[in-house]
Amino acid sequence: MRRDSSETKRKILTVCVRLFLEQGYKNTSVSQIVDEAGVARGSYLNLFPTKDRILLELTETMFGGQFGVARSIAHSKLPPVYAYAVETAIQLTLTELNENLREIYIEAYSLPETSEYIYLHTTAELKQIFGENFPDDTESDFYEMEIGTAGLMRSYMARKCDIHFPLERKLSRFLTAAMRVYRVPEEEQAKVLAFIQSLDIKAIATEVMYKLFAMLEMKYDFKLSKNGEMEETR
């Protein structure tokens, strides 16, 4: 029985992750999920009472390796704040490259379970990066600050770039606001912003996006429609 439940869960996740990436989170209905997965609606609801529970699984996978990518770009000789800046800049840029990813990230930052996962996942990283600026603060303090900076991130992701608000300005505005929260000195902020501006952040984020797609395809055993993917990333 447990094996059957595990196999049903695998089928559902495989279909859901593919559909979320190809057509968007909100455009994916429960009826479509159970039809394509070939499972009973009751079995689906027993495992995942809401779509939000599936999004939590996807969020855990997507956020798992983000800081690792950032650290490989902001090499170890640079202060930790550079890795934070690269990671958040990549995330903001990803949402400009693909509308379905934008929707997934915004939902993840909005829903109670997924946003709580993000707060908890990010808190330890923030303490490690900015701890010297807050010598008396605990992880609880960084958790509370993360609620605020995660709100900044969600708002900037939701506002699409245009000719009046280009990506470079969005990254600068977000990073300046976040670094001020974490007491990064103004002189250091200027150096961090100059470093980010020196990167081809769109090319880096595009590479990260395709690696993310490949990792999700491998983990959940599906193949994305190349047409749908390319239409979103032009």
Name what the model sees in each region.
Residues 102-107, 187-191:
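Short, hydrophobic secondary-structure boundary micro-motifs
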Residues 128-132, 162-234:
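C-terminal peripheral helix-coil segments that are non-catalytic and often amphipathic
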